[in-house]
């Protein structure tokens, strides 16, 4: 009986350490942005992330909204911009804008991405210059959601994530 308990404890410890290895670890907090690193089966993943400063409407039930820029060197991916608004998206309904600049995102379930590398580069340039960003989307039921993001701290979080995965 004791051997069985020790074996089960050993298995639990191994799985616990495995889960902890995949948990993102903060590499810096910069005003409204934070950078993270995590280890995956395909290598290191680094990202800058922000939560919205304002979400509307309050009546729509949804999970957390987040805006990301991700680096996955093991998969040769850099500057990947993605958004989740905490709900499944109606197809082709996600836009992000700052001032007169507006970008349309491709969506799948509850995540949205820009369509090509050049758009991502241009969008990141906008994020570095902007003070705020507004993300609008529609739920699969047709309700419009709006999330406001502050860009304060973005450049430092972005640079930290990029450097961590270099």
Place the predicted regions along the sequence by residue:
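A generic "folded-domain core" signal
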Residues: 21-166
């Amino acid at each position: 009986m004791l051997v069985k308990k020790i074996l089960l404890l050993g298995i639990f410890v191994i799985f616990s350490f495995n889960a902890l290895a995949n948990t993102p670890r903060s590499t810096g907090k910069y005003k409204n942005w934070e950078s993270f690193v995590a280890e995956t089966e395909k290598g290191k993943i680094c990202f800058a992330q922000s939560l919205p400063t304002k979400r509307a409407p309050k009546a729509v039930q949804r999970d957390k909204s987040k805006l990301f820029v991700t680096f996955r060197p093991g998969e040769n991916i850099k500057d990947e911009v993605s958004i989740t608004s905490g709900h499944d998206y109606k197809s082709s309904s996600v836009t992000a804008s700052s001032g007169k600049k507006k970008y349309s995102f491709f969506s799948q379930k509850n995540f949205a991405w820009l369509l090509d590398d050049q758009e991502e580069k241009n969008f990141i340039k906008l994020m570095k210059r902007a003070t705020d960003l507004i993300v609008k989307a529609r739920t699969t039921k047709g309700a419009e959601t709006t999330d406001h993001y502050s860009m304060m701290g973005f450049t430092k979080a972005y640079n930290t994530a990029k450097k961590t995965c270099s």
